């Protein structure tokens, strides 16, 4: 490879990569170009040379894709929170289906060439869909700013009007920044070793319009005045909490969360039932598409009244509780104590007596349940982006529940895990759901059915 940094080269884009970048070949060398689209002929400048590929910056487009659109966001190229806003939305959906195909081709689970990968289910109005805002804070020119860090940098992009963020959550964080200035509240800066407010989280219930606000701080700060002003200005705010995180790691939250004002949880609805959300509990970022995602999961698992169901990575119990009136029993686990408290509370509020929730890692709790005699016939897993733990995979291959649905937020770890799972299960179909329009991320529901004959035996 004779390419060098700052060298300018012509390139034809052959496809798009998993991060939404354009991919082409220059003299057999793989070139990644953010912002370029499939089919375009461009001129780019090399920014980084690696062992077997190079990265480049888009300079000019000589032949433009007919699917290229002007991004509506004025800070799109600077922010990095969205990666494919320059691609027409219907083609974004095609791209996300292709992401699944790319991941499967890379990991090659048995029979992947014939998997039924269904068209991505998109949104009619793919704007302002994020019900949860999580912005970092810094001080610039004497004023507090909140936003996202530019990719691979420590530069915070000030965001005043995010086009994918719920409008009320954006208004609240803008007001919070003003009040942090007015009350002279210290703001975190790792380079200057300043302690203070480092992250602002705002979450809104789509069903009730109730809002939670969390200040993540590296030290105790006096928020009394800010809380008084905010709750007077925004009656939708029902909870204000503080989370303490003094670590220098990239983790957003620390272990300790305290309610400073208001109620300890807000109410949300999905599939016609209501449930509680405490500040630290996980819930999907896009409530509208969550309805679609959970409906797809219900259809795929196809439970009966005799089934015993495990809801792994259960969060507040929202998926498992959608099945509770259709099965004999539901068990779930999560590593966040507040989530398990919420799950138990939600089950009780709905009047279910056939549910059980336990705090712990799925890879530890599920083997214990099987050894204790709980024979699950159905399983739904909704793991984090890291996918299924190896210990959990071994457990599933050993005990082999008859039905399984895998809800994935990372196509790469999904494809990796399927390499093991297809030793026991057949992939009936994969349904992609667009939970994050204008980004390179997608969600997928995989229906897995136990093979009639397989090489793995129960132990």
Swiss-Prot record:
Binding site for [4Fe-4S] cluster: 73, 79, 82, 162
Domain of life (superkingdom): Bacteria
Active site: 409
Domain TRAM, chain residue ranges per copy: 2-60
MF terms in GO: 4 iron, 4 sulfur cluster binding; metal ion binding; rRNA (uridine-C5-)-methyltransferase activity
E.C. number: 2.1.1.-
PROSITE patterns found in the cross-reference section: SAM_MT_RNA_M5U, TRAM, TRMA_1, TRMA_2
Similarity annotation: Belongs to the class I-like SAM-binding methyltransferase superfamily. RNA M5U methyltransferase family.
Residue positions binding S-adenosyl-L-methionine: 284, 313, 334, 382
Enzyme kind, highest EC tier: transferase
Keyword field contains ATP-binding: no
NCBIfam families linked to this entry: rumA (TIGR00479)
BP-aspect Gene Ontology terms: rRNA base methylation
One Pfam family of this chain: tRNA_U5-meth_tr
Lineage: Bacteria, Bacillati, Bacillota, Bacilli, Lactobacillales
Gene3D superfamilies the record matches: 2.40.50.1070, Nucleic acid-binding proteins, Vaccinia Virus protein VP39
Keywords per UniProt: 4Fe-4S, Iron, Iron-sulfur, Metal-binding, Methyltransferase, S-adenosyl-L-methionine, Transferase
Annotated protein name in UniProt: Uncharacterized RNA methyltransferase SMU_1779c
Originating organism: Streptococcus mutans serotype c (strain ATCC 700610 / UA159)
């Amino acid at each position: 490879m004779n390419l060098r940094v700052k060298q300018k080269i012509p390139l034809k884009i052959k496809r798009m990569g998993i991060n939404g970048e354009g991919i082409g070949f220059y003299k057999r060398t793989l070139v990644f170009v953010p912002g370029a689209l499939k089919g375009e002929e461009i001129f780019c400048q090399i920014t980084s040379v690696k062992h077997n590929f190079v990265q480049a910056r888009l300079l000019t487009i000589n032949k433009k894709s007919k699917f290229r659109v002007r991004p509506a966001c004025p800070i799109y190229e600077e922010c990095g929170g969205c990666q494919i806003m320059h691609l027409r939305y219907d083609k974004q959906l095609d791209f996300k289906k292709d992401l699944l195909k790319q991941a499967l081709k890379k990991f090659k689970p048995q029979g992947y060439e014939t998997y039924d990968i269904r068209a991505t289910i998109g949104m009619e109005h793919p704007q302002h869909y994020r019900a949860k805002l999580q912005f970092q804070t810094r001080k610039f020119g004497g004023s507090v700013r909140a936003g996202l860090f530019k990719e691979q940098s420590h530069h915070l992009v000030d965001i005043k009007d995010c086009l994918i963020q719920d409008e009320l959550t954006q208004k609240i964080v803008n007001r919070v920044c003003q009040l942090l200035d007015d009350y002279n509240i210290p703001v975190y800066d790792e380079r200057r070793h300043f302690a203070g407010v480092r992250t602002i989280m705002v979450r809104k219930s789509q069903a009730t319009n109730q809002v939670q606000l969390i200040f993540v701080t590296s030290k105790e700060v006096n928020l009394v005045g800010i809380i008084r002003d905010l709750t007077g200005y925004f009656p939708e705010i029902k909870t204000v909490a503080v989370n303490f995180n003094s670590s220098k790691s990239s983790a957003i939250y620390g272990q300790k969360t305290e309610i400073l004002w208001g109620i300890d949880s807000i109410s949300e609805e999905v599939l016609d039932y209501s449930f509680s959300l405490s500040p630290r509990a996980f819930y999907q970022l896009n409530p509208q598409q969550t309805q679609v995602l959970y409906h797809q999961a219900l259809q795929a698992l196809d439970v009966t009244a005799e089934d015993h169901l495990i809801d792994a990575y259960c969060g507040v119990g929202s998926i498992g509780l959608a099945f509770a009136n259709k099965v004999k029993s539901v068990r779930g686990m999560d590593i966040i104590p507040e989530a398990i408290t919420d799950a138990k509370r939600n089950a009780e509020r709905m009047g279910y007596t056939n549910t059980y929730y336990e705090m712990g890692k799925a890879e530890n709790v599920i083997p214990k349940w099987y050894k204790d005699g709980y024979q699950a016939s159905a399983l739904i897993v909704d793991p984090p982006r890291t996918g299924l733990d190896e210990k959990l995979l071994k457990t599933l291959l050993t005990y082999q529940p008859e039905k399984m649905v895998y809800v994935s937020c990372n196509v790469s770890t999904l494809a990796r895990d399927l390499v093991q799972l297809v030793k026991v299960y057949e992939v009936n179909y994969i349904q992609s759901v667009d939970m994050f329009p204008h980004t390179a991320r997608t969600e997928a529901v995989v229906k897995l059915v136990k093979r009639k004959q397989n090489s793995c035996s129960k132990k």
